[in-house]
């Protein structure tokens, strides 16, 4: 089934053996529909079963305007999503699986087809031109079909601020990337990040009825605050509240 897909593909052949790592590269870099289906069949046994898992996960993420019918995004009735839902999905991906950037930032790379006929090289080229055109780009994924037109979920990082810009239904690929760049530029212009790298020292805390009369306290992590209102972050006051 995977070997018969249309659209963007890496031309997998029936009986071909590939690693999961290679298939993720094919999906992330070259938008390979055949690699998507091969992964779906490997994970869930069939594309339909995997699509059911996709819809369940989408519902759990609050993607209220999304319904998946296939695993690769080719045009089909009732297959739909929204820019907001794509942003939710993208945020989950880059937050829970930051290693995706190791794939989404590949510009060009070769894979090796391994079939009964032997081995052959196939070149992958990233469909996300922002990787080369936008200085702070970290990914993430392009998409285009006759109905959806030109789309992209673009991720970028500057000064520890990570942003997602989603463009859908652009008339051509140049507009898609130009609009994504403009959105990211705007986001970076209005966002500033405060990180407390010198938090107040924490005292020991008294314990009643415990083995130890006092325990040491520590911070779980660095306190961060994202400001989009243009406030003077130098005026932030620190207050320490203990139980």
Language-model regions: role of each:
Residues 63-64, 75-80, 84-243:
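Domain-terminus/edge residues, biased toward the C-terminal soluble/receptor-binding domains
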């Amino acid at each position: 089934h995977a070997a018969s897909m249309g659209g963007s593909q890496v031309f997998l052949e029936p009986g071909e053996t590939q690693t999961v790592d290679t298939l993720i590269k094919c999906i992330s870099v070259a938008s390979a529909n055949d690699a998507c289906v091969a992964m779906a069949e490997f994970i869930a046994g069939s594309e339909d079963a995997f699509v059911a898992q996709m819809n369940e996960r989408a519902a759990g993420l609050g993607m209220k305007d999304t319904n998946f019918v296939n695993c690769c995004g080719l045009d089909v009735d009732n297959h739909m999503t929204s820019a907001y839902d794509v942003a939710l999905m993208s945020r989950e991906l880059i937050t829970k699986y930051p290693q995706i950037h190791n794939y989404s930032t590949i510009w060009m790379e070769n894979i090796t087809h391994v079939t009964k006929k032997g081995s052959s090289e196939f070149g992958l080229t990233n469909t996300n031109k922002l990787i080369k055109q936008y200085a702070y780009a970290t990914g993430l994924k392009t998409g285009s079909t006759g109905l959806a037109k030109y789309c992209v979920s673009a991720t970028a990082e500057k000064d520890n601020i990570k942003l997602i810009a989603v463009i859908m239904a652009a008339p051509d690929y140049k507009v898609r990337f130009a609009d994504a760049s403009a959105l990211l530029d705007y986001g970076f212009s209005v966002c500033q990040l405060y990180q407390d790298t010198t938090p107040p020292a924490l005292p020991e805390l008294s314990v009643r009825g415990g083995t130890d009369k006092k325990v040491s306290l520590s911070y779980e992590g660095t306190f961060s605050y994202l400001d989009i209102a243009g406030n003077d972050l130098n005026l932030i006051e620190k207050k320490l509240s203990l139980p």
